[in-house]
Amino acid sequence: MILPDRKQILDRELIRRIADTTISGSGHSDGLSEYASIRKAAFAFVESAVLGDQAYSPIENAELAFIVWILAALDENIITARTIIKARDTVEKQLRLVEHYEDLEEFGSRLGIEISVFGEQIGKDHLYRIGVADFATYASRVTGSKYRLSNQIVREGYVYVDEDVMAKVLREAFVSFMFDTLDQIRKEDAIETIKSVLDDLEKIRESYRKAHNVRMIAGKGDASMFPPCMKEIIKNLESGVNVSHMGRLALASFLHKAGYSEDEIVPYFRNAPDFDENITRYQIKHISGEISGTEYTPPKCETMRSNHLCYMDDDPLCHREWMKHPLTYYEVKRRNRKIR
């Protein structure tokens, strides 16, 4: 089972050895060295996440470490979100399969969360004890009234929960751990460290592009799946508001990435007070790479916030730990319209 270990994940020499080890004819019956096996499993996990394969894929610590460096080197928001969600679900499954309480305690400890099964137990279904602050932080990200603090037994600063609730809390803490750890690795450092597998990285990127483009084209046009930021920009444009350059760039690049053609994008800007169709078409061609040679990607959520273009309000999906990009929101909604 996975036991999160930030020190191991950030061990560049370990990661370099995993990346550099070549297939050997000895040591394993299948002809793979241990490091090569780790590398193979890590790439397979990321690719399965990219392709939307929701089958349970158990992974170990070293594989998880290499997966993080793959994500850092790729630096693709949707690939990162999908992979971490798949890892989250894998962790939850493993937590539900543990045979010893101590394993959950150790898992929580690795994430800085104190869990106890030795304290007073209130009711046969409430086996685990966790601090109120930790519970409130992570349980708030789980959908369902069952996981609300108001529906738990609370005593003297601790919450008493059953195994199901605890697994959900720990999986969300794991998501935070993954993003926090990933943020400590610079893309340039990741590329240099695992440069011997750049071809494999490109294969993952190509798999993503193919799968992503098919899904986007199939689902384009359903604006109900757009994130709140894009809906707000569209609403302002329709009302004749003079939307900022960054807002227009964000919308045009979002629509392009969502599979919209130039002719389909132009109408969104017709009510802008300074609308000029020739200029608008030129800018769309520039954003799409037809003129510039560089295809623009819409800004990340962090950039949208810093430019006062984030309108998440109470949208629960926007508040998910892994939600870092408007396209990620759209992709997730495409797969499951009811998700919150």
Swiss-Prot record:
One of its GO terms (biological process) is DNA replication, synthesis of primer. [4Fe-4S] cluster binds at C229, C301, C310, C318. GO terms for cellular component: primosome complex. One of its GO terms (molecular function) is DNA-directed RNA polymerase activity. Binds 1 [4Fe-4S] cluster. Keywords: 4Fe-4S, DNA replication, Iron, Iron-sulfur, Metal-binding, Primosome. Its cofactor is [4Fe-4S] cluster. InterPro entries: DNA_primase_lsu_euk/arc, DNA_primase_lsu_PriL. Heterodimer of a small subunit (PriS) and a large subunit (PriL). Regulatory subunit of DNA primase, an RNA polymerase that catalyzes the synthesis of short RNA molecules used as primers for DNA polymerase during DNA replication. Stabilizes and modulates the activity of the small subunit, increasing the rate of DNA synthesis, and conferring RNA synthesis capability. The DNA polymerase activity may enable DNA primase to also catalyze primer extension after primer synthesis. May also play a role in DNA repair. Belongs to the eukaryotic-type primase large subunit family. PANTHER family: DNA PRIMASE LARGE SUBUNIT. This is DNA primase large subunit PriL. The lineage of its organism: Archaea, Methanobacteriati, Thermoplasmatota, Thermoplasmata, Thermoplasmatales.
